[in-house]
Amino acid sequence: MQTLTRVLPPLRLIMFCQSGENPAQFPDTGGLCVEDCVRLRTPEGLLDRLRRWPGAMVISAGRPSTQLLLWQQVFLRYPRTVVFCSSNAFLPVDVSVEGYFRHLRLIKRAMSVRVLARMAELAIWSSLQTSPYEEEMKSALSVPELVMEINSRTLVRLLSERLPKQGRRVLGLLLSGCSPEMTARMLGTGVRQVWLAEQTLKQRWDIPTGVPLSDAVRIRIPDVGPDISQQSGLVKTGAGNAPDLC
């Protein structure tokens, strides 16, 4: 089955699975027309391969919010790269990352080969027809600016939904960085009431049981060195190593 042969030349495909991620999150790629395929595990190896394989498509195992700084580097250097992040589950912050980077898409591991092939076709054509300038500018933000932008998008999107009054107040405080204990004090209620409001919101957005709501909707600025332009490490969320998502 060669679903892309009529419209696109054979792909160069990079299967990227950073240490700590589960390669079982990769989707079935048997229906893609692939000229070359390589599996990589380090950010340095990925960036070097993209240098040698311009126009290659990347399928990455794991959620994009846990690798935010890596994708920032990828789109800064190679703004037309198409990246698919594959996982069994995604959090609200991941949706915000997808909305920020034009050529990054979220896919579920169980996605059919036909749907994946069609998505790849559309994404690659889109990357070829759009100017790389916008992606370069978005990727040139400092780390704090990038994290603040992603968190702001999450805040606006989630608070625009029709939420119960208590849930909206709890969410707003948690997104502002308040702990559950501080949130309870500011609302004049008990920690259990805050916890119950959290559970309601987690069910609404399919957030796994073991992942705190604050970690699912907010990225923390990582501890990086002064030369952040060279930083390609991970932006940590508390859910980054949650077994529920692997």
What would you call each of these model-derived segments?
Residues G45, S179, P212:
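Residue-level recognition of oxygen-bearing side chains
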Residues P144-L196:
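Helix-turn-helix DNA-binding segment
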Residues L196-C246:
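Basic, Lys/Arg-enriched C-terminal extension of HTH/homeodomain DNA-binding domains
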Residues E35, R105, L159, G172, ...:
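Generic anion/oxyanion-binding catalytic loop in active/binding sites
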Residues M1-S142:
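N-terminal regulatory/sensing modules of transcriptional regulators
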